[in-house]
UniProtKB/Swiss-Prot annotation:
GO annotation (BP), single: pyridoxal phosphate biosynthetic process
EC number: 4.3.3.6, 3.5.1.2
Lineage per the UniProt record: Bacteria, Bacillati, Bacillota, Clostridia, Thermoanaerobacterales
Entry similarity comment: Belongs to the glutaminase PdxT/SNO family.
Subunit (UniProt): In the presence of PdxS, forms a dodecamer of heterodimers. Only shows activity in the heterodimer.
Protein name according to UniProt: Pyridoxal 5'-phosphate synthase subunit PdxT
Pfam family, one: SNO
Ligand binding (L-glutamine): 47-49, 106, 135-136
Amino acid sequence: MRVGVLAIQGSVREHIEKLKLIDGVEAVLAKDKNTLLSLDALIIPGGESTAIGKMIVDFGLKDAILKLNERKIPIWGTCAGMILMAKYIVNDDKVHLGIMDISVKRNAYGSQLDSFKTKLIIPAVSNNEIEAVFIRAPYIENVGNGVRILAKHQGKIVAAQQDNLLATSFHPELTDDLSFYKYFLRLNS
């Protein structure tokens, strides 16, 4: 299975390293339209959502990502990637991809200094607790019909799925746990 990580900015290397640990996965740096369109799944990493969103347009990648979604190819956004996928961003008129029926609040957990780790119980993903790293993290304020809430932290939605789309506020690539990767890859079957 060819799994790409949108290689514009952010935690690209960390996602690639995790994907390399999973049997049957070819980890691909996705930097251009042709590479994107050849993928079986795509991860949009954390980083700076405004910068990544601008570069997606400037590099001509937006249409390719939208085509992947039309083809129901699994797409997973972590942190900034979740913001890019959201149909609505609280207090911001700018929508980047707008492919997932969620409303996201940017930097909802505060500044870099407010970053934290916690353990989450997410039965759909793992029978074990999952370590979650939140860095200037957003959360999901509202979900539309057809969006499944996978996890909450302190009453706030931090992981959700809508058909082929997966979004997490936190960074699984910064832990040793591959549970979320394996869950994501099952969306392809």
